[in-house]
Amino acid sequence: WIMGHMVNAIGQIDEFVNLGANSIETDVSFDSSANPEYTYHGIPCDCGRNCKKWENFNDFLKGLRSATTPGNSKYKEKLVLVVFDLKTGSLYDNQANDAGKKLAKNLLQHYWNNGNNGGRAYIVLSIPDLNHYPLIKGFTDTLKQEGHPELLDKLGYDFSGNDAIGDVAKAYKKAGVSGHVWQSDGITNCLLRGLTRVKEAVANRDSGNGYINKVYYWTVDKRATTRDALDAGVDGIMTNYPDVITDVLNEAAYKSKFRVATYEDNPWETFKK
């Protein structure tokens, strides 16, 4: 999965997919009542990027729905996975469940079109703080209560705080999650980070009894780092330059080992060599 980083304006969806992304990451900010408000990152953000592009969250969802609904004039067949980077740092811990409920209602109405031919992309809820695990239950309970448990098949999870792998496993246990887990690891492109924890996550994924199904590394803009991440065995690479990742995947060393994922590839299934 080539994951376009910080896609917060509707116009950027096309831009990143046209460069080779089959997945995008979108920032979600919340108001003081735990309502998802904007798709917005703000300053500081990655080096070489404009941090200030934004939409109202529900408007973005409608644009995203157009881009991922077959038959729509804006449809992009390649775009199959969306990571919502939930900026829950502005919330109190006791608001996490509410944030999950409100997020689910917004997605149900504006993205999934109340289950009536809505967007088809798989969705990952990415949460920066392990203490905010109740967000997951708030979200999943709401989908069930609203009569759409089938949409849980489209839903995955990530804790993005670079916490110890064992601590992340405990948070999922508390949240009642088993499966559909992506594990992120990374740092802003302005800084360097080794692959120690990525390798730990990959080992957990491949152990047969770990909690992780997929591993992605962020934010990768250089060819050398891309090669290192692929050599470590990641499933996804988040990038500001999807074309760079595409180029590396076309190199002889990687062409036979990797391909770009399509809608038919289940993002919750651990890949077995």
UniProtKB/Swiss-Prot annotation:
Protein's UniProt keywords contain Cytoplasm: no
Gene Ontology molecular-function annotations: lyase activity; metal ion binding; phosphoric diester hydrolase activity; toxin activity
Residues reported to bind Mg(2+): 25, 27, 85
Active site (catalytic residues): 5, 41
Documented EC number(s): 4.6.1.-
Pfam families, per the entry: GDPD_2
UniProt cofactor(s): Mg(2+)
Keywords recorded for this protein, A-Z: Cytolysis, Dermonecrotic toxin, Disulfide bond, Hemolysis, Lipid degradation, Lipid metabolism, Lyase, Magnesium, Metal-binding, Secreted, Toxin
Domain of life assignment: Eukaryota
Presence of the UniProt keyword 4Fe-4S in the record: no
Localization terms from the record: Secreted
Catalysed reactions, as listed in the record: an N-(acyl)-sphingosylphosphocholine = an N-(acyl)-sphingosyl-1,3-cyclic phosphate + choline; an N-(acyl)-sphingosylphosphoethanolamine = an N-(acyl)-sphingosyl-1,3-cyclic phosphate + ethanolamine; a 1-acyl-sn-glycero-3-phosphocholine = a 1-acyl-sn-glycero-2,3-cyclic phosphate + choline; a 1-acyl-sn-glycero-3-phosphoethanolamine = a 1-acyl-sn-glycero-2,3-cyclic phosphate + ethanolamine
EC class of the enzyme, as a word: lyase
Disulfide bond entries: 45-51, 47-190
Stored InterPro entries: PLC-like_Pdiesterase_TIM-brl
Tissue distribution of the protein: Expressed by the venom gland.
Note describing how the cofactor binds: Binds 1 Mg(2+) ion per subunit.
Family that this chain belongs to: Belongs to the arthropod phospholipase D family. Class II subfamily.
Name used for this protein in its record: Dermonecrotic toxin LhSicTox-alphaIA1iii
Organism this protein belongs to: Loxosceles hirsuta
